[in-house]
Amino acid sequence: MTIPEKPQGVIWTDAQWQSIYATGQDVLVAAAAGSGKTAVLVERIIQKILRDGIDVDRLLVVTFTNLSAREMKHRVDQRIQEASIADPANAHLKNQRIKIHQAQISTLHSFCLKLIQQHYDVLNIDPNFRTSSEAENILLLEQTIDEVIEQHYDILDPAFIELTEQLSSDRSDDQFRMIIKQLYFFSVANPNPTNWLDQLVTPYEEEAQQAQLIQLLTDLSKVFITAAYDALNKAYDLFSMMDSVDKHLAVIEDERRLMGRVLEGGFIDIPYLTGHEFGARLPNVTAKIKEANEMMVDALEDAKLQYKKYKSLIDKVKSDYFSREADDLKADMQQLAPRVKYLARIVKDVMSEFNRKKRSKNILDFSDYEHFALQILTNEDGSPSEIAESYRQHFQEILVDEYQDTNRVQEKILSCIKTGDEHNGNLFMVGDVKQSIYKFRQADPSLFIEKYQRFTIDGDGTGRRIDLSQNFRSRKEVLSTTNYIFKHMMDEQVGEVKYDEAAQLYYGAPYDESDHPVNLKVLVEADQEHSDLTGSEQEAHFIVEQVKDILEHQKVYDMKTGSYRSATYKDIVILERSFGQARNLQQAFKNEDIPFHVNSREGYFEQTEVRLVLSFLRAIDNPLQDIYLVGLMRSVIYQFKEDELAQIRILSPNDDYFYQSIVNYINDEAADAILVDKLKMFLSDIQSYQQYSKDHPVYQLIDKFYNDHYVIQYFSGLIGGRGRRANLYGLFNKAIEFENSSFRGLYQFIRFIDELIERGKDFGEENVVGPNDNVVRMMTIHSSKGLEFPFVIYSGLSKDFNKRDLKQPVILNQQFGLGMDYFDVDKEMAFPSLASVAYRAVAEKELVSEEMRLVYVALTRAKEQLYLIGRVKNDKSLLELEQLSISGEHIAVNERLTSPNPFHLIYSILSKHQSASIPDDLKFEKDIAQVEDSSRPNVNISIIYFEDVSTETILDNNEYRSVNQLETMQNGNEDVKAQIKHQLDYQYPYVNDTKKPSKQSVSELKRQYETEESGTSYERVRQYRIGFSTYERPKFLSEQGKRKANEIGTLMHTVMQHLPFKKERISEVELHQYIDGLIDKHIIEADAKKDIRMDEIMTFINSELYSIIAEAEQVYRELPFVVNQALVDQLPQGDEDVSIIQGMIDLIFVKDGVHYFVDYKTDAFNRRRGMTDEEIGTQLKNKYKIQMKYYQNTLQTILNKEVKGYLYFFKFGTLQL
């Protein structure tokens, strides 16, 4: 179908317009960061409905997350409503408003689940299945692995024995089990897991594939050998400039001849390389050279450095790639084949038994969703089934968001339900391979890359490719600097995609023309003589200084108004690769009293309150675990002192367990009687809880512990009590989650928690910070994807990449399979095999490529300004980075492949055009002035020494002052002693006032007077209300998604706060539009709409009170006030026994010079039989007379005007006071 011509004045760019209307073939939209892909996707769906007349439920829209799906469906629904209002007679649009609720806008997992629920009979499974939690799934999988390994121990096949010798230790099979588990997850990410496992042995058995692996290594080694040859030639050129270095030149000449032979004919002669020695030692330098001028001495050092680089590169190739002869490597592969085949057999056994266990428990996991869906959609020969054909007929288009994060199974599912081939298909894909950062979840970016390379701009003969490159998020300085970095860093060799004109970012946001350069801040660490802080702590303090500087000097631009506002805390985000720096940052921000929140999924199990409960549970499960038993005794619950524990141990120093020592101490006649009683009470508790745990689920045991010892109340009263309380409730809810699994009992729950900890499935502290809270945030790059912030501080750049997996004896790769090191069982020695060397090299390349993509995601989160924070031990290392080798317009491939961290590359790229000391051959071909505007960096590079950071000075001064004070006190200065005594003896003259609140709400005053009228002591009631804490109703007991009455009340007040008042009244349609507007502005949540009582609001809109307000001269909403109680109550002047009153009035309007206030009430009330409306009105007036009297008196006091009031009850109507 032809793309319609774009009219004049539309907001869409040409590429966006094509993305909205291109059809008739598969379409791949490469949408760069901030290019408006979600808006384009929504518009395409809308145009399919409006222009093409397609029903919304005949489109399949696949998103990456459930949140994205909900947001997408809401946007589409909103657009359909707008279109329906504009064309109320359109029957098609009316149908869409109904069908949107059945529309398939969901994650692929949700689609698969629906498919299974509708066609479970094909699978021969019970339709009443449930989805297992991840932790339950892992526990069951590990249980299965244990059982399968035990079965194979009974068989004792020779290959199995060799596997255990290689992959297990004398103490445990943990590594062996971990490899089996990894292989299982890799296999199920393929459409045919069994076939994938069967193919693992092929490279070990077939010489043709072994030859391919040798060629792969040869190609990889060429990068390093070529770089080595370049370094050798540079060394030769530098030595040629000097006198008295003939011997040096002779050595280098010999090396050049050797290298020429290795590279002869453009091929790498591996046998020659491995059969000869390279990197002969250079002669000592003569005194004549050492006494030469400074330039010559520098040249000598550079020459030696280049020769050293040449030698290290050759050594790397020989040690990493070709440490053994090719024939030996092939022989090793043959010997490894039985082990690899047997390992695959074990994994298939695990898969079979794991599936059997899941079926017996009637549970499915997310992998089952995908594979069962495939089973439904395909015949045995892999062709689409009849069901698949029916879906092909039903779905007129399939739209996939975040396509770069799909895997091979998901790709197969999509291919089963799409129609046609690429040149005439109905598959629309949107994504950005530069933001593919989920390889650990088995995402396969090669799917996107293959299509990107295959599809064409005009779509001739294949699919159509569209590049969305215009960025509407960031300032041009952020974009041009990002482009410059990636044009020199990313290509097909490292990064897996070419960063060219099609891939780069183009400026599209309407910012003003002010200059906002990117800031690269390099912190040079202070040594131990100048600071007691570690390097990480120094960086944390430095980041705080940057935040303070932003808050003091930077402003945020409002594109709509064209004006600036001051920066606030919530405008700033700190991005890091992981949460390793979180604790240091928390402390640094706390020291400066700056509100700070870590958006972390880590640290939950390290919180004091959570550790206490876990120690309690572990001690109950097994009191012979000393660390947990003693931890519980020392806790705030039992408060045993160190000297008491010492007394217990002294009497029984040889006991294996502390529990035994406690029992022995109680029975010892010499024991302290008071301590014995305390211990008896403790053991009684332990035994009581043990008995209780046998008959009750874990969550009830936790609940009993909380109630018995007032755990919630205690931790709620500490600093950060809100978060601590949430953490305790969170653990309680995790116990509920566990109880809903197929496991039971305290021991299994502890295993459940241990598995979460081991897998890094920490939950972070329970989140008590909302998206609009004014705090500085820290989050990982992964969690920031899709978000944007005015100020981004990208720190931790100097933290090395995590290459731990590359050191494992087994390397896994989706494309190539399994690379296992060779292990000589007799000699108990391990060697890299041909497969493990090749796959390890491939894995390292893929790892560095994904780390580059993480950098891209981080840089493109910034709207206004970007701060890059690097850290070095000393400034000398910066010179080495400036002199990294280049190849054309890129940092050399070998330099990129071996880069240890992001800073290594970023600093090298950005510093090359600014450093005067870099020789021309180490500079990029294009001078900075020749670079086009869209890629010309605007960056300030600052080298900061931590000794100069003001925070350090402050810390030092505080420390010095504290020491001086201590010394003065210790020296016994009489004046100081007298001053201290005076302060300690001081009697506060207003003790009684401390028992009264200095500030009270109107509601609190209302309760006070009601209590006094009933003859009850208000002080006692107030203390009870403040001190007593009860559980909030847990989410698991609430109806799914149902709000509580107080939450609905708040929601209704929020709607009323923004409700427009029009003389002609607003219609029901306009009311829906107005509420959708509140959702769009994030004033209320999207899912809150269903809880808004539309009929009650429409009743108010049709009321006389609404008309009166609409005709008022002035209207004020949500007016807060603070006033002296003495003025309101008209107390005598000088009466100091008063408080400040604070409150909030819902609405005030002015009519004919009189001020009226309105208070909305969502109260429900009981209409007793026979009561008239007048009687109910009187009852309601009496209920709120005190509160209303305070409102009236307060306003009269403040305004000095006549004030009247209304109460409006949504369930009753208007009452005038």
Curated annotation (Swiss-Prot):
Residues 476-786 form the UvrD-like helicase C-terminal domain. Gene3D superfamilies: 3.90.320.10, P-loop containing nucleotide triphosphate hydrolases, PCRA, domain 4. One of its GO terms (molecular function) is 3'-5' DNA helicase activity. GO terms for biological process: double-strand break repair via homologous recombination. Disulfide bonds: none annotated. The keyword tRNA processing does not apply. Its cofactor is Mg(2+). ATP binds at residues 31-38. Its EC number is 3.1.-.-, 5.6.2.4. It holds the Pfam family PDDEXK_1. Keywords: ATP-binding, DNA damage, DNA repair, DNA-binding, Exonuclease, Helicase, Hydrolase, Isomerase, Nuclease, Nucleotide-binding. The keyword DNA damage applies. Signal peptide: none annotated. It catalyses: Couples ATP hydrolysis with the unwinding of duplex DNA by translocating in the 3'-5' direction; ATP + H2O = ADP + phosphate + H(+). Belongs to the helicase family. AddA subfamily. The heterodimer acts as both an ATP-dependent DNA helicase and an ATP-dependent, dual-direction single-stranded exonuclease. Recognizes the chi site generating a DNA molecule suitable for the initiation of homologous recombination. The AddA nuclease domain is required for chi fragment generation; this subunit has the helicase and 3' -> 5' nuclease activities. This is ATP-dependent helicase/nuclease subunit A. The gene is addA.
